[in-house]
């Protein structure tokens, strides 16, 4: 194993501060960094020696032999489940990385439902209230091509359910709902059996469209409530927990295990085929290149390597380390060459940032002459990431397409959700605009349908009797 690089910022909030120095021996589970503000503890994922402590990372030289044992976490009261979650350094494993101990520090039984915005909830009566409080488990595996969340259900459903029950206990929620895409038949059947005797836990089936895993989309699909871009799920008496995060919670409480590993999918232009290579319990800090080699190595010339998903991931390098939030490593085919043609960018809250889309346009040899935003993309404060008013449920984009045409664009690159891409296609091609989606090079690599015209119904019924 090559050197492990553990970044000091793997979560929402401020970077952690190292509490080790060069030359220190560490074990799997040794605490090596602590928060300086909002954040989560960071632990060594291997047995070894600290080589360097840099401004943004701790570099560890692993021992040749690695033991399975780890240093257990310790808290003053071993029965304090929330304290165990906090000490274990668990964050949202689905990508955002919000510290889970902070998220679960709420008493949902005493939480009042916030006033709903009538404009985005026109179908609900003004006096609508939720009778129950909820843990909503995000099992959507939102980014196309990734499969590690579904694999965890298939192989570790008991652990996941234990984690969900702990979440319910900690937050005093009286119900839990698994939000999972209807297409995952095997996982759904396994999950159904795992909760057969859990009267307060149910399953809600989602359509196979992006972004069903966005936090507010999970609330909307499961509870029928549209939250504003400023509201948290607590406004709907709920907490949304990623599936893998729930499993980490079970590990922290049952095994006193710190958060030192990550499940992820490696996929794309890989020797042996483009199928998903799922790796469970990978030590945090292992390099992208090492995981690609474990999957078979890169097959010839490629376009780029993405860390994360096709929509929200970023281009990365072989020596970059994985973190607690890394869900995917995608090796893509080469980009098409637009030969300097004029390009318009349609930036969406559900896809890449303007910076990421400009990077893609540059790699396609296109000249960006126009930039528009999806009409539902809201900037809550200057410089903050965009938020969609109704994730996955978008109106037309005719006005933006007309602007692109006015600005003499030949091509447009879009980063929109399934529904929004569909509305772009309703008018863009008729205006002579040639459309690329920012995920096209990934979708073509993994054999997934391109995001253009929506062919999947957005409505999916719940399983009979909530199960």
Write out the residue ranges for each language-model feature.
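Gly-rich Lys/Arg/Thr-decorated short loops/hinges at beta-loop-alpha junctions or inter-strand turns
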Residues: 92, 135-149, 378-384
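Histidine-anchored nucleotide/phosphate-binding helix
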Residues: 154-170, 359-361
């Amino acid at each position: 194993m090559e050197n492990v690089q553990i970044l000091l910022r793997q979560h929402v909030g401020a970077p952690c501060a190292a509490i080790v120095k060069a030359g220190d021996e560490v074990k799997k589970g040794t605490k090596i960094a602590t928060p300086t503000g909002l954040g989560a503890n960071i632990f060594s994922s291997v047995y070894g020696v600290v080589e360097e402590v840099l401004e943004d990372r701790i570099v560890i030289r692993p021992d040749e032999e690695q033991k399975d044992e780890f240093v257990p976490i310790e808290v003053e009261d071993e029965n304090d489940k929330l304290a165990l979650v906090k000490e274990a350094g668990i964050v949202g494993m689905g990508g955002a990385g919000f510290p889970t101990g902070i998220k679960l520090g709420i008493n949902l039984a005493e939480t009042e439902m916030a006033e709903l915005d009538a404009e985005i909830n026109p179908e609900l009566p003004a006096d609508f209230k939720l009778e129950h409080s909820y843990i909503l488990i995000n099992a959507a595996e939102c980014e196309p091509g990734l499969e590690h969340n579904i694999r965890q259900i298939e192989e570790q459903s008991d652990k996941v359910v234990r984690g969900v029950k702990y979440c319910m206990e900690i937050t005093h929620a009286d119900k839990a709902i698994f939000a999972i895409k209807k297409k995952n038949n095997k996982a759904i059947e396994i999950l159904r059996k795992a909760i057969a005797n859990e009267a307060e836990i149910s399953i809600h089936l989602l359509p196979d469209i992006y972004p069903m895993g966005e936090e507010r989309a999970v609330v909307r699909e499961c509870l029928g409530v549209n939250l504003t871009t400023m509201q948290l799920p607590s406004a709907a008496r709920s907490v949304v927990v990623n599936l893998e995060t729930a499993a980490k919670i079970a590990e922290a409480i049952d095994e006193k295990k710190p958060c030192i590993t990550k499940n992820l999918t490696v996929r794309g232009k890989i020797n042996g085929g483009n199928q998903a290579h799922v790796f469970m319990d990978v030590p945090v800090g292992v390099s992208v290149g090492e995981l690609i080699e474990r999957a078979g190595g890169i097959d010839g010339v490629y376009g780029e390597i993405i860390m994360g998903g096709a929509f929200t991931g970023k281009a990365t390098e072989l020596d970059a380390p994985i973190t607690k939030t890394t869900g995917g490593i995608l090796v893509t085919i080469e980009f098409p060459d637009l030969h300097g043609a004029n390009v318009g960018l349609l930036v969406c809250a559900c896809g890449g940032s303007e910076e990421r889309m400009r990077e893609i346009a540059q790699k396609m040899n296109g000249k960006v002459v126009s930039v528009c935003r999806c009409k539902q993309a809201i900037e809550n404060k200057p410089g903050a990431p965009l938020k969609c008013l109704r994730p996955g449920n978008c109106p037309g984009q005719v006005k933006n397409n007309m602007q692109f045409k006015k600005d003499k664009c030949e091509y447009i690159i879009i980063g929109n959700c399934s529904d929004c891409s569909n509305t772009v296609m309703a008018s863009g091609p008729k205006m002579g605009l040639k459309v690329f989606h920012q995920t096209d090079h990934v979708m073509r690599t993994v054999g997934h349908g391109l995001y253009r015209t929506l062919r999947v119904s957005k409505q999916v019924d719940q399983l009979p009797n909530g199960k």
